[in-house]
Amino acid sequence: MTQAREYDYIIIGAGSAGNVLATRLTEDPDVQVLLLEAGGPDYRFDFRTQMPAALAYPLQGKRYNWAFETDPEPYMNNRRMECGRGKGLGGSSLINGMCYLRGNALDYDNWAKIPGLEDWNYLQCLPYFKRAETRDIGPNDYHGGDGPVSVATPKEGNNELYGAFIRAGIEAGYPATEDVNGYQQEGFGPMDRTTTPNGRRASTARGYLDIAKQRPNLTIETHATTDVIEFEGKRAVGVSYERKGQAQRVRARREVLLCAGAIASPQILQRSGVGNPEHLEEFDIPVVHELPGVGENLQDHLEMYIQYECKKPISLYPALKWYNQPKIGAEWLFFGKGIGASNQFEAAGFIRTNDQEEWPNLQYHFLPIAISYNGKSAVQAHGFQAHVGSMRSMSRGRIRLTSRDPKAAPSILFNYMSHDKDWQEFRDAIRITREIIEQPTMDEYRGREISPGPNVQSDAELDEFVRQHAETAYHPAGSCKMGSADDAMAVVDGAGRVHGLEGLRVIDASIMPVIATGNLNAPTIMIAEKMADKVRGRDPLPPAKVDYYVANGAPARRRA
């Protein structure tokens, strides 16, 4: 057998985290990095991934989407639910909804209360959010101006339904916020998006790898499916993978960095002999290290669409007509403008359903069209919808192997809606949304309620609607959680190092101990930026010196 190739670092997964690490680590010219990606390139000529308004298309096929399904979910009428994950350079940032949302400051302050995670508080995370970002209206105390990720803000003259929805939330007694990523997340306001100034998707492949891919010390291999991490004793020393039908082995002089995401990272650990021995023995996998938390603590956001017909003919419904699409496509392709240049999620809301919640437990995305997330089942009329879901469900799931074959889909169970609080939050979500849409500012727009429909009112009727119609927001997290070695279910420490092993870190959304309040792409990029300094042995960026909103007992809603 030929001598295995050697690199200083081997990164598994060219997604939202892996591309950040590849770019930061190769800033040191004498560090050799191999980046392995099971999917293909992010073809820049493919409008399905590059046009923001086409965001539904990559979810429909399997070129860019692993398209996993859950096991039958016991609290959801045993539905097998979608679990889409990005495949290709950029990972899930290549197929996500491009919502740039960082989470709430108290998410991170609460992580920092966990022993060993003291440096994960908000003020120590904020500099890394800023380092990653270039915001189109320039930097400030909360936002960056020269980072790899392009962030666009909503502009004057966008669809009038966005402003109407924000005003309706405020009329209903909830706060207003100028910037859900700034001083105050709580309230209704505009939503930023990860798109470039010329209207292209700002994936981490475009943002980070475009900087790094010409460097001689970075090797990128696509169509490279990782089989196992190889160990000598308790030290990770390399990776076995398959590329174009050929088995390959590479060695890591320093570390293996596992960045395959909340679904694949625990699978790879389990295949490699790291996990719960009972599960590994089912597949005759020799145990390298017993870590029962691998694949446990799995979390996600569940959401519903509350849909209405729109009385004014101003929704995006005409954009679905085939005869309008060539003009929209040309305007986007040649000028980077128009409907095609936006993901259409330009209004947000984060609210507390009661005064006891310390920070928001519901999230809204507003869309000026009535359609499902994956682009199917569009309502054939002018309409609008509010996506709403609970933020920090106590429900926990797990990921298990079904086979030693790296191409086999895992067994995924989220245990959605397994707590009483989940049901109360979703009942509240539907009722509060109806109250918001009933506000006077919506009178000129509000038509018939399409979904759930005006006859769905009682707790039992609302619960059945949730069981039948709630969908994933595509935010899996937590399956290799950070924590101290004293926590038997923690998989990594605060620097991403796998407990009990050497030369191996996990750096992606799987290490979140508790899911963030919002979409997960921006937090995952931040985690990778912060971890890059730890891997490189660099001093952390100085903590931010800013104020941030804490409700501190303030009422969740102002009553008229």
Swiss-Prot record:
FAD binds at residues 8-37. It catalyses: choline + A = betaine aldehyde + AH2; betaine aldehyde + NAD(+) + H2O = glycine betaine + NADH + 2 H(+). GO terms for biological process: glycine betaine biosynthetic process from choline. Keywords: FAD, Flavoprotein, NAD, Oxidoreductase. The active site is at H475 (proton acceptor). Pathway: Amine and polyamine biosynthesis; betaine biosynthesis via choline pathway; betaine aldehyde from choline (cytochrome c reductase route): step 1/1. Its EC number is 1.1.99.1, 1.2.1.8. InterPro entries: BetA, FAD/NAD-bd_sf, GMC_OxRdtase, GMC_OxRdtase_N, GMC_OxRtase_C. GO terms for cellular component: membrane. Its cofactor is FAD. It comes from the Bacteria. GO terms for molecular function: betaine-aldehyde dehydrogenase (NAD+) activity; choline dehydrogenase activity; flavin adenine dinucleotide binding. Belongs to the GMC oxidoreductase family. Involved in the biosynthesis of the osmoprotectant glycine betaine. Catalyzes the oxidation of choline to betaine aldehyde and betaine aldehyde to glycine betaine at the same rate. This is Oxygen-dependent choline dehydrogenase 1. It comes from Chromohalobacter salexigens (strain ATCC BAA-138 / DSM 3043 / CIP 106854 / NCIMB 13768 / 1H11). The lineage of its organism: Bacteria, Pseudomonadati, Pseudomonadota, Gammaproteobacteria, Oceanospirillales.
